[in-house]
Structures are given as structure tokens and as C-alpha cells.
Amino acid sequence: MSSGKIAQVIGPVVDVLFAAGEKLPEINNALVVYKNDERKTKIVLEVALELGDGMVRTIAMESTDGLTRGMEVLDTGRPISVPVGKETLGRVFNVLGDTIDLEAPFTEDAERQPIHKKAPTFDELSTSSEILETGIKVIDLLAPYLKGGKVGLFGGAGVGKTVLIQELIHNIAQEHGGISVFAGVGERTREGNDLYWEMKESGVIEKTAMVFGQMNEPPGARMRVALTGLTIAEYFRDVEGQDVLLFIDNIFRFTQAGSEVSALLGRMPSAVGYQPTLATEMGQLQERITSTKKGSVTSIQAIYVPADDYTDPAPATAFAHLDSTTNLERKLVQLGIYPAVDPLASSSRALAPEIVGEEHYAVAAEVKRVLQRYHELQDIIAILGMDELSDEEKTLVARARRIQFFLSQNFNVAEQFTGQPGSYVPVAETVRGFKEILDGKYDHLPEDAFRGVGSIEDVIAKAEKMGF
């Protein structure tokens, strides 16, 4: 095990000098610095660059407070390695695989795997055309998710990405009954804490491994924590042949941390100040999140859109890797429609008649057509009023508004805030409900009866309460 000395510390970047004759560590190797003689507390560094003359530049995975020039640094001879397997279920980790849930730490002989690996080869990959039911109407009808597929939840600040991902965990993890991995990447510690206790109370935690690298942690930890979660998921897929759910909140923070690290390493920034290696880093992560012949990984990723600008390089780079996109829209939040999913901007390659069936496809296409026409008529309505529309257009607008409200529903995870119980709506119920609205069966019911309800039966019950 070769050793070197700290030459300089610049925030989370640490330069280490190895004497002549010492073997230089490889890129991505983990180095260890002990903060005191008892060797109880250590800081892990990851090699990022080799500068020449025995000098390597590393990124710290923890705060560098207390490090000084001249301290000894040991090369572990391998990348950061984290615990994998059944022992990880029900536990909470940091980027290094250390437990942070105040329960017993892992033993030294626990199975570990390196977080840096190659993506599966082309001949190992497998695709599926089976739909993953979420119980959320707008998703199941207009942008359905594939088992073993990749889903992106796009949205600006405060439009409901984390609440939506928590509802998906609640619905899918409980219905799915398989193994789930949650990676909290650069998000609020409070949200992670809330999620942990909710999962503990519901019992889902027993089949879930959670990995956190939150906002307050150094960029190195935020950049690598997604790989830690992915490594745990890959083990269940490849070794145990499981169908795994991987939730990542938030992929943008992975890019943001990479941007910070890139600047600290002295690389020239690219478009909008992002790292020049943005597409490569995103590709290396996303290509590992895939389904193979041994098992599948269905990933649901929240993706923050800076200033609601979808042309920003970070969300634009992530777009290319996804099967389904669920776009959240601020205008719908302002209308009080939750989840604020934009039915026209969201898309899925699963919305095809050979996958969802002819009826589902036809209903979804007609819903989109009606909403698109309503969108086009809104300018006329704003300037001239409803009176200038033909009778046919007035009927279309009335149905479009009912559809828009019926696409909303109450969430189980938001019950403590709204006071309304959440609802899980099967796909068949969703398709039937929208088909009947399109056929004009409920034109006599008030628009408000369609807001924040589950199935079409709930609409009828709500209308009866309102006196209709």
C-alpha cells in the first residue's frame, strides 16, 4: 500500500505528493487520510487527476476541516467500495457505504463492490414492453411507464417533483413488493428524514435501501452518491436476478456537483458554465441504469429544471436517456391542479397501441387532441369571450376543462397537508372514466366535481353531495 503526503488543500480539492519510487494510485482509487494518531476518524479522497512529478489531485468525500500539509495519505488500491446484498435492506447509508441510521454498523467482512464499473455490454441488455401501473391517472393514461424503463420527472422549483416521487414510492413500492433503492442526491436533509420515517411506518423500508448525499455535503459526495445507490441496485439485478426500483432525487444535483468539481479541478467551463464532460458523466451513469437478461432496473429520476428552462444543458442532456418524461408545469400549479403534470408536454414511448392496447391509445390520443384544441382556443376566449365560439367549440371547451380537472387527484403522501385521503386508480378505471367524459356522459355535472378526485365514481358521489 503506497503512501504520500498532502501538498495542498483547496476546499474539497486535495493535492497529494507521492515520493519517487512510490507506486502512483490509479484514477478513481480511494485514498485515506487519518485525522489523528488513533486512526479512528478518516477522510476518504478519490483520485481525479495525475498532475505529473508524483502529484495527484483528489476530491474529498467529506469535509476537509482539520487536514494540514504533510499529513500521511494511504492508497487503498481500489475505488470506493460499498456494502451490497440483503444486509443493505432497511438501512440508510452515506456515499461511502457507512450507515447513518444510528443502528449497528456493518461488519468488516460484509460483501462490498466498487462504485465505478462498466455498463452492461450490448448483448447483455434486455427490453420489456410491460406497463408499470402507478395509480396516478395522468401518468397511466398519457405517459405510461415501462417495467425496466427510465423515467424523468422534470420541473422547476416548487412544482411537486419530490411529492410525486414520494407518491410513486408509496404506490409502486407497496404494490410492486420487490426491492427498491432510493438515492437522495444533493436534496434537502429534511425531505430525506421525512421519507425515511414514512417508509418505516408503512413497512416499505424492509425492502428498501436508502443512500443520501445531501445539500450540505461536499461536491465529491453529491457527485458519487448516485453511483453508490446504483451499485446496490446493480447487485440485486445481476447477482440475485431481482426486478429493482431505483429512485433518484435529484439528477440535476449530480450534474451541479460535477460542475463544481470540474471548476475546482481547473477545467475550462463549457456552455452556461457547466463542465465540458457533462454528456460523458451523464452517459456513464445512465448507461448503467438498465435492464439485463438477469434482472431489471426501473428507474424514476426527479430532474430539476433551472428557471423552468428546458433548453438548459443539464435537463437537455438527461432527456436523451429516458423512455418516459413527466413534465411538471408551473401554470397548472397556479390553477391548483395537482399533480401539475403537463399532459401535452409529457411523453412516453410506451404509449403505442401494441403496448397499451387500442382502446387506451385511442382515448389518450383524443384527450390530447381535445386539450390541444382548448389550448388553441384560449387566446380567442381571453380576447373575445366564450360567446364568439361555435356550439361545438363550447362543448369541447367544457369537456376539456372537465378533463383538465379530472387529471388531478389527491395523493396519499400529501394527506397530512391537504386533509384529503389519497387515491390509487387502476389503469382500466382511468381509461373508462376519460372515455365516458369524452362521450359527453357527464356534461351535466359541475366542473368542480372533477377536481382532486380518484375514479369517475368519486366524481358522481362528489356531484351528488353538491346537490346535482
UniProtKB/Swiss-Prot annotation:
InterPro entries: AAA+_ATPase, ATP-synt_VA_C, ATP_synth_F1_bsu, ATPase_a/bsu_AS, ATPase_alpha/beta_chains, ATPase_F1/V1/A1_a/bsu_N, ATPase_F1/V1/A1_a/bsu_N_sf, ATPase_F1/V1/A1_a/bsu_nucl-bd
GO molecular function: ATP binding; ATP hydrolysis activity; proton-transporting ATP synthase activity, rotational mechanism
Organism superkingdom: Bacteria
UniProt KW keywords: ATP synthesis, ATP-binding, Cell membrane, CF(1), Hydrogen ion transport, Ion transport, Membrane, Nucleotide-binding, Translocase, Transport
Membrane-topology annotation of the record: Peripheral membrane protein
Compartment(s) where it occurs, according to its Swiss-Prot or TrEMBL record: Cell membrane
The UniProt record lists the keyword Methyltransferase: no
Residues that bind ATP: G155, G156, A157, G158, V159, G160, K161, T162
CDD domains xrefs: ATP-synt_F1_beta_C, ATP-synt_F1_beta_N, F1-ATPase_beta_CD
Induction: Induced by a decrease in external pH from 7.5 to 5.7.
Broad EC category: translocase
Assembly and binders: F-type ATPases have 2 components, CF(1) - the catalytic core - and CF(0) - the membrane proton channel. CF(1) has five subunits: alpha(3), beta(3), gamma(1), delta(1), epsilon(1). CF(0) has three main subunits: a(1), b(2) and c(9-12). The alpha and beta chains form an alternating ring which encloses part of the gamma chain. CF(1) is attached to CF(0) by a central stalk formed by the gamma and epsilon chains, while a peripheral stalk is formed by the delta and b chains.
Function of the molecule: Produces ATP from ADP in the presence of a proton gradient across the membrane. The catalytic sites are hosted primarily by the beta subunits.
Name of protein: ATP synthase subunit beta
Species of provenance: Streptococcus pneumoniae (strain ATCC BAA-255 / R6)
Gene that encodes the chain: atpD
